[in-house]
């Protein structure tokens, strides 16, 4: 997973590679420059990585973490497969859900923290 952090007028933004946009959207809407929130998530990941699943419910995006994988999903995303979506809506779906390994997510959060503190 590739990512980049930028800062403009004190506001930090994340961009992630295609397929991981929801992770950047989660960061940009739920975390931003809140280093305490990042440290809390990192601590939960590092202590609970092998013990139990972790769920972080946010206002717009939620994060679901198990031993091997992290899923970031928009709270308004309906995962009903009974109703087919029009072709144009799949693009929005791709920006609303993303998966990555826990190690990649830890690296993303550590990099965000380092960027904020620099």
UniProtKB/Swiss-Prot annotation:
Q: Which family does it belong to?
A: Belongs to the UPF0231 family.
What's the protein name? Answer: UPF0231 protein PM0457
Instruction: Kindly list the residue ranges recorded as spanning the membrane.
Output: none
The disulfide bridges present are: none
> Which top-rank group of organisms is this from?
Bacteria
A Pfam family recorded for this sequence: UPF0231
**Which InterPro entries did the record assign?**
UPF0231
């Amino acid at each position: 997973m590739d990512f980049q952090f930028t800062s403009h007028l004190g506001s930090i933004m994340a961009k992630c590679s295609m397929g991981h946009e929801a992770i950047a959207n989660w960061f940009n809407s739920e975390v931003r420059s809140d280093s305490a929130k990042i440290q809390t998530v990192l601590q939960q990941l590092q202590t609970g990585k092998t013990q139990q699943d972790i769920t972080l419910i946010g206002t717009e995006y939620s994060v679901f973490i198990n031993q091997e994988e992290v899923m970031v999903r928009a709270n308004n995303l309906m995962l009903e497969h009974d109703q087919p979506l029009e072709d144009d809506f799949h693009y929005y779906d791709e920006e609303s859900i993303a998966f990555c390994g826990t190690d990649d997510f830890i690296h993303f959060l550590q990099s965000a923290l380092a960027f904020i503190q620099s």
